[in-house]
């Protein structure tokens, strides 16, 4: 005589469906948190220029226009992917500089449509080392790297101003993820209910 109830499928479904619903609720909570962050960053972007000088950079300074003092080494900057202020794709040129409190700030000196030769890159580094006052937008570095990125408002040498990241560059897909988890839970529950109905018919048929 077979089992009166399909224990294993029932237990697995009873564990999986609440877990998926819980993940959906968690994503909704993350969405609310991300939306509050975006509101704060939008306020930062619209705020007046923050003159820091040699003071430490506040932790909530992302997307603020700032003026700060930096000590940059006379070395060639490194290239990175960037866009010119016009929107054209090109090369960004970054240099790691030291702020007044000893922390490091990666500075985007500007952007170019094509690579720079070695002599032009050396000249950029020398020009950057001669400057102490920097103006631009602060953003958090990508890929979880520590420290800040300053997108300089005033391009150096032959460079054009680089396009600073906008709020649209910050993903906010949590509500979509929540819908997916709720859909997974509903689909699994429906599949289990249909399978259970067939299982019962097979036992009574």
Segments the model singles out, each with a brief description of its role:
Residues 1-205:
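Surface-exposed, charge/polar-rich loops and edge strands
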